[in-house]
Amino acid sequence: AALALTLVLPGLAAYEMPIQTVNEGESVYLFNADIDKPILEQNADQQRYIASLTKMMTALLFLESGKDMNAEITIPASLTQEFKDIQNANGSTINLRIGETVRRIDLLYGLLVASANDAASVIASDVSDGDLTAFVARMNQRAKELGCTSTSFTCVHGLYDYGNVSSAHDL
């Protein structure tokens, strides 16, 4: 019984306690699904650079693509310049190489666990038949379908492109 009270009481206390706001310039959107309303909003619709959160949309589209996650693919030569750009930016990678064969599921793990920018590019290329621009367009379309009105993508990984933005409310 003591354990049950320990688990329940903090949750009840959260409903009773006033919620302090965060620093004035920060964004927050805290939604309580139990009561179906936001319990804290501050600059919730302000667009912010989202960096590697971009990879969540890349992962979503990969999973929705219906591709066999256990199948192996070969990393295409068309990604040579993309890989050079990623390497020059000194971001996270799993050191994929052009011509290497890799399972799709391993790309997904690299994307989500290591935040690997090279994995994001290979995934996008795989899903869009080599057209990263088309993949980015699909990312933006999917964001709109999800009701994300403050979200805009301009690259598949969020590494060096300041055009990838979203808001606390959208996220």
Task: Kindly give the residue locations of the regions a language model identified.
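Sec-dependent N-terminal signal peptides of Gram-positive bacterial secreted proteins and lipoproteins
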Residues: 1-14
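Active-site-adjacent loops and short helices of periplasmic peptidoglycan-processing enzymes
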Residues: 13-169
